[in-house]
Amino acid sequence: AYLFEREEIPPEAIRNTMLYCLDCHSKEGIPGKRGTSRAAMMFLSNWLNEYGELGIMSVSSEYLSGRSVYISEESRINHALNHGGVAVVRLYLDEEHYVLMTGVENGNILLFDPYYWDEPYEQKDILIDKDHPRAYNRIVPFKYFNQENEEIYSLGPLEEREAVLIYNEKTRTVPEEVIEYFI
């Protein structure tokens, strides 16, 4: 777990995540083989907020779609990543799938991509990282995400974009607490 220690996650949270995600069926009718729908992600975000409001878990969430989903120093995604949150984002790598963005570093997004990839990417600036298995396994420059096509790590067409920002309210930082000093 990245945002929470394993002991902090109630079994119901894991059960409900598994129950509500992977809700799309393949052409052959196999459940879960076409991933998770946008409706399920919106529902999951609302469900996490309710869990936080009830005090069951110190979690909050925000569902983003369309033009709100982009990468830049001013974006809500980058804001979340810079203040202790994560972003579950739908993007492309051969096909649409979700990745977990966990940080920002030197114009790159640190992310965990569940798709196994053992060969270096053709794009030499996309790096596979095996040294941080609890935080990220890819380092991807900002420039790939904001494309409106279906190329590697692009967020795709504006109207189809989606992200869920998630925070652990115990570790979330507010902008006033994050001070950078320039010499």
Feature map (PLM): residue ranges:
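Cysteine-nucleophile protease catalytic domains, especially the papain-like/related folds used
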Residues: 1-65
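Short amphipathic alpha-helical segments that mediate assembly, nucleic-acid/protein binding
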Residues: 14-15, 73-74, 159, 175
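Noncatalytic regulatory segments and standalone regulatory/sensor domains
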Residues: 82, 104-183
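Intrinsically disordered, low-complexity boundary segments flanking structured domains
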Residues: 41-46, 73-77, 151
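Generic low-polarity alpha-helical segments
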Residues: 3-4, 77, 164, 180
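Alpha-helix N-cap/loop-to-helix boundary motif
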Residues: 32-36, 69, 93, 167
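Hydrophobic transmembrane alpha-helix bundles
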Residues: 46-62, 90-103, 125-137
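Active-site-adjacent substructure of cysteine-protease-like catalytic cores
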Residues: 62-121
